[in-house]
Amino acid sequence: MTAFDSKTMIHEIFHPKSIAVVGARSDEKVESEGWVARLLDFGYSGKIYPINLKASEILGLKAYPSVREIPGPVDLVIFNVPFRISDKIMADCAAKGVKVAHLYTAGFSETGKEEGIKLQNEVQRIAKEAGVRVIGPNCMGLYYPKGGLTFGRLLSKRSGTVAFVSQSGASAINLVAQGNQRGIFFSKVVSYGNAIDLDSTDFIEYLASDPDTKVIAAYVEGVKDGRRYFDVIRDCTRKKPFIAIKAGVTEGGTRAAASHTAVLSGSREIWDSFFTQAGVIGVENLEELLDVVMAFVYLKRPSGRRVGIVGRGGGLGVMATDMCEKVGLKVPQFQPETQNKLEQLIPDAGTSAKNPVEPDSALTSWGTFYEEGLKAIDMDPSIDVILTHLALDVYGGAISNLEAALDEAIDVLIRLSKQLTKPLVVVLYAGGRIETIGVAIKEQNRCLEAGLPVYPNVSSAVKAISRFMTYHEFLDRVI
């Protein structure tokens, strides 16, 4: 299959005109997590065919005893059945001329048991001979909010510009859910499991040219064709940032990956070398992945790696400086004119007008400092990006006072972000108090709505900024 044909085929997979759910539950409710309920709740506009041997109707839709008895064409069939009958269901799909089968069903080669391996091979044989394309088995399938497709009813219906390709179903659900909470929304997500047919390479090749997608992320345990994967990723990174978690690189992780999705993982050294050559941004976990995605969705590109830091707490400022330097960012001295301006704005006791800047500890005065201080830092030719951190749990007194003062400070940051010539990054340390966590979430959402990137701590922020810059430096070299 040519690259063009492959992309066309994947596009059709994300745009099925009809879906059959084999194993649809007869007792499904609108508010349930059943596959039919999800499609209805998410507003899928195509035809839905519940398949159930005993039910005549499910959620107001006519049910059928088998795929073969559906009167019209079927683009996608979701297998929600015990693995031991999956070969029979695939034979029905083959006879019906189904285009794509999504095997949510698990119990195949990932178990390491002979029965599961043999059955997977048989399902694969039937599908290949009939030309049925397969997602899975052992996977969650598709999440495409714009098209009404989802593998979780509680996930956001709002579309974004980030795509995620995941070998793991749980990782796909967790990433979307956590991303939604952090103001990150998705164009298309696929969980592909054991990948007996379609794998990450197929989906990434399509997403690299997808106009809805600006950033691509992936969780990968292993690949079938390393040469093709490398070529596709190398092409992708010249068009869009590609952030990846490579799992299964330790001895224990390799063993776990083999039992999870039945793949061969490869050594850390091989994958690290590949990521560097191809321009892939490698991360260790879902949290780091979302941190980097946050930068690509919300951060304007700085002209360099020099950071101006503003935050309460001298020790926090020192640690923030160390964190920056450790990941390849710089925290330079301000120009004399900047220094003079900041000294006029900041009182002497318990503060610092040097980089990192520590303004007055009273949060109520921060809005005033931001108004002039950030403008001065913005004009300093020694600085490329400004990072301000607010530790909410160190402020005593009534939570209403904290909220009012923080509201004022964030108001100023939002207004200034549209005036400053350099990117602004906000860190909100929520701390351990339930009250401050609630305030932090509220202010985070205000910042995100205004297009300001927000992080829960300085470490996450500076690592993300550095990786963001590394990708753009890679592009500067290869394009």
Regions found by a protein language model. Give the residues of each.
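Catalytic-core regions of core metabolic enzymes
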Residues: 1-479
